[in-house]
């Protein structure tokens, strides 16, 4: 990818078809091998490269996985890392929505951006599941919320040179997907720290944004157990929402759920 970029700089773009790197049996699934196999570093490392040649995509379901693969193969001189669950997940995106997601890098999944009090932003298939569950609880308790999905975080970064600037989305497109001033909860497949840097354009402030992700907590756990251990379960997201909205968590969570996320109850009540 370094040589391919040099060729572009010289006006001789490479002709080789872009290469997909499929990352599956990943951090949130591979419980049998404990932390030795529970590591999202591959995607994080490639996000550190220039995004116009090093693409990192997080398909949300089978439809988006197919479209993401098609997008990679239609390009030239790039590596495309696809972080894909190996286990069945529900299809969230239809055909038209799938094409829009891959084209734009992100899309609204549920809710109304114009009237929501908080925006839940998921990066990763299992993270989207938890964000949707959190939204359901917020709506049930009278708080308008929306869920957005970021499939390709590199599209939303601050461009580091002119070539990358041609790849990232414009400010107008970004504001259309992520309205300024809206409190946001991010929940990501990766460790949160790399995404805080990549998504700096979406991070409004410490008081208006929270990031959840892989905290290096692992073990012989299933997906739900991994999400809980890393404080990425839907109830943890609700707790973040309560902090941003300035309301008591007890108005959004049952007592048993509060006890679970505080470490004093049965975690399975939020599985």
Q: Predicted regions: what is each one?
A:
Residues 1-5:
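Long, structured ligand/cofactor-binding scaffold of large enzymes
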Residues 57-63:
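Acidic carboxylate-rich catalytic motifs and surrounding loops in phosphoryl-/glycosyl-chemistry enzymes
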Residues 70:
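Hydrophobic alpha-helical positions that pack around
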Residues 11-19, 24-44, 48-51, 55, ...:
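Thiamine diphosphate
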């Amino acid at each position: 990818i370094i040589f391919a970029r040099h060729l572009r700089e010289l006006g001789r773009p490479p002709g080789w078809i872009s290469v997909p790197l499929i990352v599956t049996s990943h951090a949130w699934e591979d419980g049998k091998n404990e932390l030795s196999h529970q590591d999202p570093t591959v995607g994080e490392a490639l996000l550190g490269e220039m995004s116009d040649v090093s693409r990192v995509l997080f398909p949300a379901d089978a439809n988006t996985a197919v479209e993401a693969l098609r997008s990679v193969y239609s390009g030239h001189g790039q590596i495309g890392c696809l972080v894909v669950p190996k286990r069945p997940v529900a299809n969230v995106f239809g055909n038209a929505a799938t094409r829009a997601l891959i084209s734009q890098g992100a899309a609204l999944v549920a809710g109304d951006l114009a009237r929501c009090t908080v925006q839940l932003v998921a990066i990763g298939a299992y993270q989207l599941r938890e964000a949707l569950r959190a939204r359901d609880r917020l709506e049930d308790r009278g708080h308008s919320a929306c869920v957005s999905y970021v499939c390709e975080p590199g599209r939303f970064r601050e461009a580091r040179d002119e070539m990358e600037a041609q790849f990232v989305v414009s400010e107008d497109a970004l504001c259309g997907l992520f309205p300024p001033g809206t409190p946001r909860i991010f929940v990501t497949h990766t460790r949160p720290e790399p995404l805080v840097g990549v998504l700096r354009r979406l991070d409004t402030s410490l008081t208006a944004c929270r990031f959840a992700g892989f905290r290096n907590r692992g073990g012989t756990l299933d997906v739900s157990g991994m999400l809980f251990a890393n404080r990425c379960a839907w109830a943890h997201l609700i707790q973040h929402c309560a902090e941003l909205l300035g309301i008591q968590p007890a108005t959004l969570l049952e007592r048993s759920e509060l006890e679970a996320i505080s470490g004093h109850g049965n975690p399975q009540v939020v599985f």
